[in-house]
């Protein structure tokens, strides 16, 4: 992949990350994450290093069964920078309970010595869903 990605390439990167979560593939989520990534969502804001990201993927008390993107928006403001925002419908099991959730997500990808990696991700729950 070059320093300027097409919309399809950016979507493919993001889906690769989601597929790794679905497969509980911590090595892949770690490799696709920046050395330290900033994540924001219903539980607040945190910085997560690659090792912790991999561990959270493998050991988290959740399972992602399915997901679908909608209303995808992308921007490549500079060489080696890609931003993607989208709505995502996801089916997850948390604490033994299956849930359907809809959120608005955004990720910032940077191309570095290890290829394209996600350095920031945010998730906002939609539809007045409980912040569990």
Protein language model annotation of sequence segments:
Residues 1-31, 38-132:
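A beta-strand edge to alpha-helix "cap/lid" segment located at domain peripheries
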